[in-house]
């Protein structure tokens, strides 16, 4: 997932800087007194972060957090899921406690910063550090992705397969338009994936490594993510950096990142998604968005921004 990718990129960057750094998984514990900084990630799914927060807050370390926050209330109400909506609201106090106790809150957009200050009371510095992606395969030969998977023109969607990412609606749209949809990513919602695959034009290729994704992006008509919840999508950034046309959700910080260079859709509106996919089929690829993303949202900028925050805290 996106947060795991970011965690490992930060870990490797700090190792190269000679910093002693460890990753502590959801079900692991550490002696937090051994650390100057504990960096927590993702307060949407609060339980893992809160467990580490409780233990770390009793030690002498500095706590910082990357909230990866998006208010899910609208989606839970739309999907008529009272139980999930109640749980979301009941956990607000735990999210706020983490944010209040954090010395730095790393937001990945001005949008997320404004959402945090609107929904919570905070005390520490809020520092905007935009997400970034690395480009690894520009000089590496492609293989013919269409040939390997027996595809013609196709729409690509990379990300966890689940109701929040809205691949089912995208499957319906692509089926109506008679265009192949390729889904790549892990899933913990098998029944949801099965519904997507009930449409003959939807193809699921499972998890893929970066090199295979590079080929998938390069040969696709467009990358589409009509998600209900997206502060910003690493897969959309990566797709854009490899030269894809992209269709992205209106929700979240999409317009802050992609300006007028993406095609936008309303995830709550079938016809909006359909219209956006149709536009992406005929839009010619150009390098404007590709170069813009590579310059402004590269991995180096993101890692340096987080490292600067750490250094400021230590000094």
Language-model regions, residue ranges each:
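Aromatic "clamp/platform" in nucleotide-sugar-dependent glycosyltransferases that forms part
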Residues: 228
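A charged, aromatic-enriched C-terminal amphipathic alpha-helix characteristic of glycosyltransferases
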Residues: 2, 282-314
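Conserved donor-binding/catalytic core segment of Leloir-type glycosyltransferases
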Residues: 146-165, 171-176, 182
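Short hydrophobic beta-strand element within catalytic cores of glycosyltransferases
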Residues: 245-248
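Short, structured helix-loop element that forms part of the nucleotide-activated donor/catalytic region
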Residues: 4, 180-205, 212
């Amino acid at each position: 997932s996106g947060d795991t990718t970011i965690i490992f990129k930060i870990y490797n960057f700090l190792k190269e800087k000679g910093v002693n750094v460890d990753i502590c998984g959801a079900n692991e514990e550490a002696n937090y007194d051994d650390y100057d900084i504990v960096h927590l990630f993702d307060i949407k799914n609060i339980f893992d972060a809160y467990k580490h927060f409780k233990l770390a807050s009793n030690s002498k370390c500095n706590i910082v957090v990357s909230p990866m926050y998006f208010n899910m209330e609208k989606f839970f109400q739309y999907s008529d899921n009272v139980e999930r909506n109640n749980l979301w609201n009941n956990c607000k106090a735990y999210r706020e406690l983490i944010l209040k106790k954090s010395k730095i809150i790393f937001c990945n957009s001005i949008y997320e910063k404004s959402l945090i200050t609107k929904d919570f009371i905070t005390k520490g510095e809020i520092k905007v550090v935009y997400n970034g992606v690395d480009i690894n395969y520009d000089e590496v030969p492609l293989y013919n992705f269409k040939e390997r998977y027996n595809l013609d023109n196709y729409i690509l969607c990379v990300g966890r397969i689940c109701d929040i990412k809205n691949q089912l609606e995208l499957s319906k749209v692509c089926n109506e338009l008679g265009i192949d949809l390729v889904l790549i990513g892990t899933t913990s919602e098998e029944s949801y994936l099965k519904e997507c695959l009930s449409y003959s034009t939807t193809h699921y290729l499972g998890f893929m490594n970066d090199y295979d994704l590079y080929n998938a992006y390069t040969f696709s008509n467009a990358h589409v993510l009509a998600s209900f919840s997206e502060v910003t999508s690493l897969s959309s950034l990566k797709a854009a950096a490899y030269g894809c046309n992209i269709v992205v959700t209106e929700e979240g910080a999409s317009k802050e990142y992609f300006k007028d260079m993406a095609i936008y859709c309303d995830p709550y509106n079938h016809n909006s998604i359909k219209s956006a996919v149709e536009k992406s089929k005929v839009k010619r690829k150009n390098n404007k968005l590709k170069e813009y993303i590579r310059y402004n949202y590269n991995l180096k900028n993101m890692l340096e921004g987080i490292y600067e925050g750490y250094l400021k805290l230590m000094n």
